């Protein structure tokens, strides 16, 4: 039996998903997101994420906290913001003594959908199917967080050890 918390980092919207594995079966224990106001001071936005992750860790005692690796696109401001959110998650995990792993978006999509360039709707459908959920998880940030947790749990043990 193992619990993994997946995180889709971002400062405006940070998704989370908690997945439980027992005897090879996966089920969602919960999912959601933290939304912060655009006008809020950056340190307060990061505090919201840090406290949210810390509360999830305390409640679920996960074996790991897993994140989607940062994608550095054309907008440096967004990349910096996502990096700050990732930092809040990593520190919350380190304070609690929980191992962290990171996965590339293409690897997550390949594991969950069988196709590394799957779109958001395909990821949501497959997360619903894999976790036997009654409906597709929303918002997409939460679905992405569940997907990274699934990736960690379904990936090979050797790959998890090097993630």
Can you name each region flagged by the protein language model?
Residues 1-163:
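Phosphate- and other anionic-substrate recognition elements at nucleic-acid/protein interfaces
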């Amino acid at each position: 039996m193992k619990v993994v918390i997946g995180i889709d980092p971002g400062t405006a919207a940070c998704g989370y998903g908690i997945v439980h594995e027992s005897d090879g079966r996966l089920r969602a224990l919960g999912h959601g997101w933290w939304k912060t106001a655009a006008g809020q001071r950056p340190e307060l936005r990061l505090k919201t994420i840090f406290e949210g992750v810390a509360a999830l860790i305390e409640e679920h005692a996960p074996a790991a906290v897993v994140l989607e690796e940062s994608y550095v696109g054309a907008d440096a401001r967004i990349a910096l913001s996502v990096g700050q959110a990732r930092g809040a998650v990593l520190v919350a995990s380190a304070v609690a003594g929980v191992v962290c792993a990171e996965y590339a978006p293409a690897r997550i999509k390949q594991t969950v959908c069988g196709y590394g360039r799957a779109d958001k709707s395909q990821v949501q459908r497959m997360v619903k199917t894999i976790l036997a959920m009654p409906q597709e998880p929303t918002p997409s940030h939460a679905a992405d967080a569940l997907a990274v947790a699934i990736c960690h749990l379904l990936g090979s043990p050797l790959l998890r050890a090097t993630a």
